[in-house]
Amino acid sequence: MLQAFDGVVEEASEEELANAAARCDRTGTFNCPHTGVAIAALLKLLARGVIKKKDRVVVISTAHGLKFTEFKVGYHRRELEAVHEKFANSPVELPNSFDAVRKAIWDRIGQKSR
């Protein structure tokens, strides 16, 4: 089947799949680790020129990221073994205060608190 459709096979490490999923999460999707494998493979094939910029590609997400909350939280808390989390968005604990939340947001985006 693979040969009939001129297909290729690629692999992804735990770090590659975790970072690929987190990278795509920043676009508004919330990917599961399995989809992270497909995304990581896609990125590697693009980098090698196997998939060209003009090519059309479909990546099918196999599950929602909410089914893998331990993986997601572990990534952003930098707790996954053997993974350098390039796109981690570390949780920030704040008091129950509108002003504290507002200040944290403004500080994060590099503007003065209003």
Predicted regions and their residues:
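Active-site-adjacent helical/loop segments in soluble small-molecule enzymes
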Residues: 1-52
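Phosphate-binding loop/pocket of nucleotide- and phosphate-handling active sites
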Residues: 40-114
